[in-house]
């Protein structure tokens, strides 16, 4: 078995007293599977890519939020102008008396959902705090570490307030049309999605929405939905015993032959080849 790449604290933190830092990825390049001896929050600002976390693939774009524990293994592939920030932290160095475990899914290896989404309002507020945190964590002045940890606590609570599951934007949300579209697409894994109907409901221009989506994500709406469905199919092929025809239906493809064509085009192998290759990992 190939040696597992592990990222180390000493390469990312200025001292053994520093609990929090910010690592920019402008843009994020392809990055081989790795683990860390620290934890991180990942926020995607724009573009798209394939994020594989603990063998589960996610097609990521603006607004995606991940809570990564040190022992988690993840990688980035098929990136397209993918811009994100990693807020890295060492749980054992945090001194602030906050309910970290209640606010951070997976904190200290506790059970928790790693993938969430942020709407435009949450992203704007998070970006402002992260900017302050990045500045403070790079300072070599008295109380810089303490200030950085205070800002990290503010960020964690802000994310807790604004995050939502990928397919269920709160009905009272004041998020933008683009946020609502991405949420609707995530909720359309099994069912057909009609953009014209969505635009009628939202009283918006289909052409303008298509342009806005592509500008922010680097993909067309159809490309994004297709790749989200293929990612779900990859997960089911590896972690379930469903027949390929049933997986096709679960992922919104009415015709299993068409599903196989799309899957092969996106991944470079047939669904059965994917299942055989990845079943050897379990």
From Swiss-Prot:
PROSITE patterns in UniProt: HTH_ARAC_FAMILY_1, HTH_ARAC_FAMILY_2
Localization in the cell: Cytoplasm
Gene Ontology biological process terms from the UniProt entry: positive regulation of DNA-templated transcription; rhamnose metabolic process
DNA-binding region listed in the record: 196-217, 244-267
GO molecular function, one term: DNA-binding transcription factor activity
The keyword Ubl conjugation belongs to this UniProt entry's keyword annotation: no
Domain of life from the UniProt record: Bacteria
Marked site: Interaction with sigma-70: 246
Lipid metabolism is among the record's keywords: no
Key words, A-Z: Activator, Cytoplasm, DNA-binding, Repeat, Rhamnose metabolism, Transcription, Transcription regulation
SUPFAM superfamilies hit by this protein: Homeodomain-like, RmlC-like cupins
Pfam families to which the protein is assigned, alphabetical: AraC_binding, HTH_18
GO-annotated cellular components: cytoplasm
Residues of the HTH araC/xylS-type domain: 179-277
Function: Activates expression of the rhaSR operon in response to L-rhamnose.
Description of how the protein assembles with itself and partners: Binds DNA as a dimer.
Name used for this protein in its record: HTH-type transcriptional activator RhaR
Taxonomic lineage: Bacteria, Pseudomonadati, Pseudomonadota, Gammaproteobacteria, Enterobacterales
The encoding gene: rhaR
């Amino acid at each position: 078995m190939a040696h597992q790449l592990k990222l180390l604290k000493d390469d990312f933190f200025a001292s053994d007293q520093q609990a929090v830092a910010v690592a920019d990825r402008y843009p994020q390049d392809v990055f081989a599977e790795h683990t860390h001896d620290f934890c991180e929050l990942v926020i995607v600002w724009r573009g798209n890519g394939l994020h594989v976390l603990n063998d589960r693939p996610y097609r990521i774009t603006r607004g995606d939020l991940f809570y990564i524990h040190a022992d988690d293994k993840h990688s980035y592939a098929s990136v397209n102008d993918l811009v994100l920030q990693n807020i890295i932290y060492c749980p054992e160095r945090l001194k602030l008396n906050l309910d970290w475990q209640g606010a951070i899914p997976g904190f200290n290896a506790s059970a928790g959902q790693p993938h969430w989404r942020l709407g435009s309002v949450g992203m704007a507020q998070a970006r402002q705090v992260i900017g302050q945190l990045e500045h403070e964590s790079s300072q070599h002045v008295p109380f810089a570490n303490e200030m950085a940890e205070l800002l990290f606590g503010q960020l964690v609570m802000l994310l807790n307030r604004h995050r939502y599951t990928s397919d269920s934007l709160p009905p009272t949300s004041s998020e933008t049309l683009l946020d609502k579209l991405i949420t609707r697409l995530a909720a359309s894994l099994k069912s057909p999605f009609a953009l014209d109907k969505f635009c009628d409901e939202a009283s918006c221009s289909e052409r303008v929405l298509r342009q806005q989506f592509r500008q922010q994500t680097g993909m067309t709406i159809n490309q994004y939905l297709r790749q989200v469905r293929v990612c779900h199919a990859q997960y089911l092929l590896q972690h379930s015993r469903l027949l390929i025809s049933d997986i096709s239906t679960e992922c919104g493809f009415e015709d299993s032959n068409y599903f196989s064509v799309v899957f092969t085009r996106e991944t470079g192998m047939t669904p059965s080849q994917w299942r055989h290759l990845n079943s050897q990992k379990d």
